[in-house]
Amino acid sequence: MLFLQFLLLALLLPGGDNADASQEHVSFHVIQIFSFVNQSWARGQGSGWLDELQTHGWDSESGTIIFLHNWSKGNFSNEELSDLELLFRFYLFGLTREIQDHASQDYSKYPFEVQVKAGCELHSGKSPEGFFQVAFNGLDLLSFQNTTWVPSPGCGSLAQSVCHLLNHQYEGVTETVYNLIRSTCPRFLLGLLDAGKMYVHRQVRPEAWLSSRPSLGSGQLLLVCHASGFYPKPVWVTWMRNEQEQLGTKHGDILPNADGTWYLQVILEVASEEPAGLSCRVRHSSLGGQDIILYWGHHFSMNWIALVVIVPLVILIVLVLWFKKHCSYQDIL
């Protein structure tokens, strides 16, 4: 019953009517993390993701789905979503209790975590692919492949015994999981893409600027090119000199901003006398083929230039208006 509850909890969220989608590769998946500190304290967290965009959360206190966007319901009705929330609450309780009952036989296991990633992928021109992966304390434990539960290599006897149990005594669970990740999940994903197409396919231009800081202990200078606020995620940023990419350019991870856009910084370490002639080039689909190029030594962005021009003009206009008003008041007197 433990894994039956677990599978239903993790996978019943996706569902809905069919819709059109034209993505070469796109996925929807649920991530769940169950933390067990001791026999009497446990906490579960859940979230739903469209590729790398979080679309759903789970409120553990109220036992409700959190819809992070106005299109996160996809094609589900409110009644269907209410039924799912009830299932989530019921199975969360049962899952937590059963895990604690098993873990109580060996107190040395506390604290521990169980992590799950389950969902589906759509590839252009191919059949949908479903996946269900379970980890224990961050290490792969088992996965669902085709119609069979498979233990991860080197996972030990625990995963092997669980997989044997699922494969031979819970055929109904296996069939349910197969249908959910191969049929229900793709339908929900297509509905989600249709409902959120304006958001998912939007183009947001990056803001770019340059900065520098000394390199500790080397006497070198670190030149930093920042690109922020862009969407979608794919972006190309690099340091150049005379149209040649500079070796030694270090790219950081592309990180999410709170508004769903992305941020990247690219660093080049140079001698203090070498920055002249360097530039940073930013290429993104939102720019329509017109790359942003920032030259070191001339690195006021257009926003800053506009600010430098506009602020004095605003001050001048305010002074003129105040002077006219003051003069008119004096004339009346």
UniProtKB/Swiss-Prot annotation:
Motif Internalization signal boundaries: 329-332
GO cellular component: endoplasmic reticulum; endosome membrane; external side of plasma membrane; extracellular space; Golgi apparatus; intracellular membrane-bounded organelle; lysosome; plasma membrane
InterPro entries: Ig-like_dom, Ig-like_dom_sf, Ig-like_fold, Ig_C1-set, MHC_class-I_related, MHC_I-like_Ag-recog, MHC_I-like_Ag-recog_sf, MHC_I/II-like_Ag-recog
Membrane side Extracellular: residue ranges: 18-302
Keyword field contains Transmembrane helix: yes
Residue spans crossing the bilayer: 303-323
Gene Ontology MF annotations: endogenous lipid antigen binding; exogenous lipid antigen binding; glycolipid binding; lipopeptide binding
GO biological process: adaptive immune response; antigen processing and presentation, endogenous lipid antigen via MHC class Ib; antigen processing and presentation, exogenous lipid antigen via MHC class Ib; immune response; positive regulation of T cell mediated cytotoxicity; T cell activation involved in immune response
Residue ranges, Cytoplasmic side: 324-333
Tissue: Expressed on cortical thymocytes, on certain T-cell leukemias, and in various other tissues.
Keywords, sorted A to Z: Adaptive immunity, Cell membrane, Disulfide bond, Endosome, Glycoprotein, Immunity, Immunoglobulin domain, Lipid-binding, Lysosome, Membrane, Signal, Transmembrane, Transmembrane helix
Bilayer topology: Single-pass type I membrane protein
Cellular localisation: Cell membrane; Endosome membrane; Lysosome
Protein task: Antigen-presenting protein that binds self and non-self lipid and glycolipid antigens and presents them to T-cell receptors on natural killer T-cells.
Protein's UniProt name: T-cell surface glycoprotein CD1c
Gene source species: Homo sapiens (Human)
